[in-house]
Amino acid sequence: MNHIDDAEKIYLFEADDEWIEALCCTFENEGDNIEIIQGYVGDTIENGNLTIDSILEGQKVNYIKMDIEGYERSALTGARAVLEHNPEITCAICAYHCHGDSEWISSYLDELGFETAISHGYMSPDWSYESRLYAELRRGVVFGKKSLHSNTPGTYS
């Protein structure tokens, strides 16, 4: 919330009606630089889904933060043009919801010219008592920074 005034434009994507109402209340005094878009973000434009590319392609995008309960792969696939064509973009993508996401997300971003790093800590995708007994701990977040001058993926500072 501290950086809202620094942003030219913020797009918030949300599918849940209850969260739409909460977001509208939270940001009602922030002016026109915040746009709340209702819909599921994925890799196709059908059945109520939309893609980040369909909304933001051709626009300057500096930062993407994504925590969408295991749909990060699909949303990133649907954001390929935005990720490819914004030379100063950074991102923080949650990677603990699905097995293998940290590796997939890192590889995908590396392929698009990002330097990537994975958070040091671990998270459990399920906090129920039974799952804590047999938890698969996963890395929490993949960070990416577009690098025009680096040929060494995996070194984000």
What is the role of each PLM region?
Residues 1-157:
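Phosphate/nucleotide-binding beta-alpha loop and adjacent structural elements of enzyme active sites
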